[in-house]
A protein has these predicted regions:
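Conserved pre-ATP/AMP-binding loop-to-beta segment of ANL
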Residues: 28-31, 141-142, 159-163, 169-190, ...
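Conserved AMP-binding/adenylate-forming core of the ANL superfamily
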Residues: 29-79, 83-87, 104-109, 205-206
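Conserved AMP-binding A3 loop
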Residues: 44-48, 186-210
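A short helix-loop-beta submotif of the ANL/AMP-binding
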Residues: 58, 71, 77-97, 101-105, ...
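Structural core segment of the AMP-binding/adenylate-forming
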Residues: 59, 63-64, 91-164, 272, ...
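Conserved AMP-binding/adenylation subdomain of ANL enzymes
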Residues: 93, 209-226, 234-275, 348
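AMP-binding/adenylate-forming catalytic core of the ANL superfamily
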Residues: 101-110, 120-122, 276, 353, ...
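Gly/Ser/Thr-rich phosphate-binding loop
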Residues: 270-341, 352, 363
């Protein structure tokens, strides 16, 4: 029998609406979603109320011409409207395309055209830009506010030319359930890798069910626990690591508009938060000696096992590694597992792991650094595909193994140690940035002969992009060229992708076959002010 068909059979009859319905029947009055906007107490939804609003939205979307398989852009900062619309698309059988709100118009044009999105849901802050970037959309629906903040007069005027989000709600009594199809796509997130354009990662309902099963086990999340979600909801951390983990056990999600150091602990205390994802910029708040003692926080979902931080923060940091393509945690480790300090834990059951020498294609021995490869069923443990990108799909997989681009080594007791990421992929404050995408923009300037973009260490964001440039002429006005490069990048790239500096050099350090040694460029960048 076909192993992939057997894997899919295990998900028979299960999808996102099945999951929502289960908890609405089992725990109708238990809080599912709590909105925690800035300086205010927001509304909350029980599981019964959440299912009702999701059905109402699904009915309304269908009435607006959205059919199963259609793709709907959701371009918004964290807000309950975004979560409800995301779940409603899944319930209807449509595909929610959640996009980064730092994206500029050119990027939104690409997202809309590449996914062939038919409609969009957004906020007043973005509707003007989105309408210009994607004029082919059938309609755009706009929320009344920007994640709890009132719109400006210009934003209000722009919003009035489009549908109101609240007008999308229909009559839940008219909802007609569809047959469950676990392998049906439900969501698309864009991720930057080593290619020049972000790739559209397709997740299925089976991916969601997998995340809802595995996520809670990996982080000891129980039905009476509460997970604080502050990472952007257009990222896999918020969607799969957090929200689907909550839905897997009927727990509670508390949603913040975005990271706020001043609101972090008050929200945790007020809502008895037990679990939180730990991003680099949250470390200072967790280690604040004046943090309140009367809190229930006990688990931080982090990348590595670091007992010293456990003691400093007064919570347990669970090691979890994954990416958009792995849906949830592909490795995991708990302080009680007895694994070495600094490891990412062990491979999560359901995935297979290999550490491969990139030059020879052979397995590395324990202690040797190689590329991390993962194997699982596509559409269950791993993403289904990169949408409409056969070249990227072919390049990403080899004999069923997904090549992550991350360099690791195996240690004692199956522990995995992170070494470095692919030289052409940067991680800026949690956002993936393709060096090649930035290089493509910088390299179009007439004064640039060659360009190499690398990461420079940053205290707050971990790393930021910088560009090393070889000029096409010897007497170039470096200040003027730098200014023009920055302007071009700001026009065409999201703010986190824009180089923080341009360094002019006479030559790049190179190795065999004249390959640019980006590691040396990173060291050169860190040595500069």
């Amino acid at each position: 029998m076909d192993s992939q068909a057997i894997d899919q059979f295990q998900m028979h009859g299960q999808d996102i609406p099945w999951l929502l319905t289960h908890w609405a029947e089992q725990k109708p009055d238990h809080p599912a979603l709590v909105w925690a906007p800035r300086d205010a107490n927001g509304p909350r939804w029980t599981y019964a109320e959440l299912l009702t609003d999701v059905k109402r939205m699904a009915v309304g979307l269908a009435a607006k011409g959205i059919n199963p398989g259609d793709r709907v852009l959701i371009h918004a900062e964290n807000c309950p409207e975004m979560v409800i619309a995301w779940l409603a698309c899944a319930t209807l059988g449509a595909v929610a395309v959640t996009t980064n709100t730092k994206s500029v118009g050119a990027e939104m044009t690409y997202f809309a055209e590449h996914t062939r999105a038919v409609a969009a849901i957004t906020q007043p802050a973005f509707v003007g830009m989105l309408a210009k970037a994607a004029p082919g959309l059938l309609w755009i629906a706009v929320t009344d506010n920007n994640s709890g903040e009132p719109p400006s007069q210009d934003e209000q005027t722009a919003s009035e030319a489009h549908d109101r989000f609240d007008a999308l709600f229909g009559d839940s009594n008219k909802f007609v359930p569809r047959d469950a199809d676990p392998m049906l796509p439900f969501g698309i997130m864009f991720t930057s890798g080593t290619t020049s354009r972000p790739k559209a990662v397709v997740h299925t309902h089976a991916n969601a069910i997998w995340a809802s099963r595995i996520g809670p086990r990996n982080i000891d999340l129980g039905t009476d626990d509460t997970y604080l979600i502050y990472p952007p909801f257009f990222h896999v951390n918020a969607q799969s690591w957090s929200m689907f983990a909550v839905l897997g056990v009927g727990a509670t999600a508390v949603l913040m508009p975005k990271w706020s150091q001043s609101r972090f602990w008050p929200v945790i205390v007020e809502h008895d938060v037990t679990h939180v994802s730990v991003m680099p910029f949250a470390m200072a708040a967790l280690g604040d000696p004046s943090r309140p003692k009367d809190n229930q926080l006990r688990v931080g979902v982090f990348g590595l096992l670091l007992p010293d931080l456990d003691r400093a923060f007064g919570i347990d940091l669970y090691a979890c590694y994954g990416m958009t393509e792995t849906v949830t945690h592909a490795t995991n480790g708990k302080p009680s597992d007895g694994l070495p300090t600094g490891s990412m834990g062990r491979v999560t059951p359901g995935y297979e792991i290999a550490v491969v020498d990139q030059d020879t294609g052979e397995l590395c021995s324990a202690g040797e650094t190689g590329e991390l490869w993962l194997r699982g069923t596509r559409g269950i443990q791993l993403f289904l595909e990169y949408a409409d990108n056969p070249e990227a799909n072919e390049k990403a997989f080899e004999d069923g193994w997904f090549k992550t681009g991350d360099m690791v080594k195996m240690g004692p007791n199956g522990a995995v140690f992170y070494q470095e990421r692919d030289k052409d992929l940067l991680k800026v404050g949690g956002e993936n940035v393709s060096a090649r995408e930035v290089e493509d923009v910088v390299g179009q300037h007439a004064a640039v002969q060659s360009v190499a973009v690398v990461a420079k260490s940053d205290d707050f964001l971990s790393e930021v992009p910088v560009a090393f440039v070889i000029s096409a002429t010897p007497d170039v006005d470096q200040a003027a060229v730098t200014r023009e490069i920055m302007e071009a990048c700001e026009e065409r790239l999201a703010s986190f992708k824009v180089p923080r500096a341009v360094y002019f050099v006479e030559a790049f350090p190179t190795g065999t076959l004249d390959k640019i040694l980006k590691k040396e460029l990173r060291e050169m960048a860190d040595a500069r002010d």
